[in-house]
Amino acid sequence: MDCVFCAIVAGDLPASRVYDDELVLGFMDLNPATPGHLLVVPKRHAADLAGLDQDDGAHMFRVAQRLAAAVRASAVAPEGINLFLADGEVAGQEVFHAHLHVVPRRRGDGFGVRAVFGSPSREELDHHAREIRTALDASRS
């Protein structure tokens, strides 16, 4: 397996570690969007969100919440925090090991989602809600 995050977890590659427990590792992003940008990575490999163990995923978010609070209290002193998970190449995922970004934010920092948000009709929203509920119900069986 040629996964850079698995190599970091195994200690085969260096990382500026911030947090380490039995399930996840938190470390500084090598290509930060902003100063203080961290990654929270499950130690068990999962290429994407669908493959992520539910307990690992829940723990990853709990740790990200703690790290976000620590970033706010640190000298980084951001005005806000984004938690960001890219799931799939088209969503911007570059390392195919599920992970959560903790991105400290300041006005004018240049980071953000560049989208044009629409105003769909209630009918269209209801249609998509039905489709997603159907898929959700099917996943329970």
Where are the model-predicted features located?
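HIT superfamily nucleotide-processing domains
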Residues: 1-141
